[in-house]
Amino acid sequence: MTNKYTDHLLVLPEDDANRRLVNGFLKNVDVKYRCVQVLHEAGGWHNVLAAMQAAEVVNGLVNHPKRHLLLLIDFDQQAATRLQEYANRLAVLPVAAQNRLYLLGSLETPERLRTACGMHLEDIGHQLASDCPPLPAGSLWSHPHLQHNAPELARLVTQVQPFLFQV
């Protein structure tokens, strides 16, 4: 459980595979894991996007300006469509909430990413944490299954790097 009055990141994973990526991310020694709370799996990308519009989530973001929410989904080879749906849903939220909501995910599924990288999901998450600040060229984030995340990832890292990563 995080302190809602200090900077923190909530993560809403679509499924168990995405949760395992997050768990690997949190095991990286450069990550201040106490600033992160992983929520229960939403059970599908539709449920993840619906959750971002729930009154409890929106009010939590508006009332707690140090809260950030990362939505982690499978894009299932439909990145453009899902990003557009996310943008449409985001547009109707209060600006105070919009600026602290982020959407990332694998182009297909985490399992396909695992196969393409030849690594366990937790190991991929660990490597992604290592590659976050300052996003070096040739990092795992530039993999074809992840490169579509670049604009949102840059926005996320800019916002959370000061409190999420060891200096």
Positions of PLM-derived features:
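Helix N-cap/beta->alpha junction signal
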Residues: E14-D15
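C-terminal accessory helical subdomains adjacent to catalytic cores in phosphodiester-
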Residues: M1-L10, R19-H40, L49-V167
